[in-house]
Amino acid sequence: MHRFALVAVAILFSAVLPTTAAAAAPATADRVTARVDGHTYVLLGPSVFGVTVQQDPLAYSAVKLSDGTVRGHWSYHYYEAGVETTFSGPISCLTVHGDRAWVGGPITQSSDPAQIGSGGWWQIADNGIGPHPVIPDRTTFVGIGTLEQTQAYCDTAPEPRFIFDVQQGGVRVSAG
């Protein structure tokens, strides 16, 4: 009789454990549908905007999951006429078409407290790898406005008004 009870308990556990484990595991794992990484430096003399401006650097890394969730972080060191302003925060929007990406997120830290709570956005073009690709990677400077403008930038994926060759560093854009 004791042997029968042990067999019955073993059968019971073998039937219950797989369903318990299946219930504990997520039904589906969100897969990565897009990824961007970059660390870019750009220096422009006064002939472009009337004053020397420098992106030194714009650094970011983000992924977009199949459920639309975007995860990542960005930081930006911007110099205008030698005066540095810093911005950083999470990345909340990302759109990828081919080798181009539109990226943005809220400013949660800045050396200019008036910018905290605003949004920042930029566009990049991944033109290959290596220290000297035939066509360099390209980036815009960061635009700053409302969080609604930031999301609209990613949603509409506009052509850039100004986009510049990355002089040092690089970008990586991938879908899937």
Regions found by a protein language model. Give the residues of each.
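Secretory targeting and sorting signals
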Residues: M1-A25
